[in-house]
Amino acid sequence: MVTAFNKFVKKYIKPSAVGSDEVSERSLQLATAALLIEMMRADAEITGDERRMVMSTIMTRFHLTEEESGALLQFAEEKIRDATGYYEFTSLINKGFTYEQKVRVIENLWEIAFTDKYLDKHEEHMVRRVADLIYVEHKDFINAKLRVKKKLIL
């Protein structure tokens, strides 16, 4: 599994300037992508708009090309199949992201959840659960939700 990940990152993700941070950054990209995919699947109805929003979020957040983002998402889907829960991904986020970056992940999850203009109870539960797992305070969880609703004019 580690070998497949190393092949993936060497082929599709630009290396960072500091060698020791490479794996960390790549793992964070994978963890974030996996959570976004899980959010897209949370309401059991995956729309084209949700797929586009996930792709756009990954491209923007990590400054990746469409090809790199597509490869990252494909690899993340494979990792999700092997995962037993969110902990595998949230533990990486806890280790590698600042508090502000964690709040941004929650905001990204809300963006995916609201893409179809409807918030399913399973989507809200997932965002709440991830926020708890990455230690985002309730006020920041709510503020992220309100920012996204305002941005999307809901």
Predicted regions, residues:
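Short acidic, Gly/Ser-rich segments with clustered Asp/Glu that frequently serve as metal-coordination loops
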Residues: 41-45
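Small-residue-enriched hydrophobic alpha-helices in membranes
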Residues: 1-38, 48-154
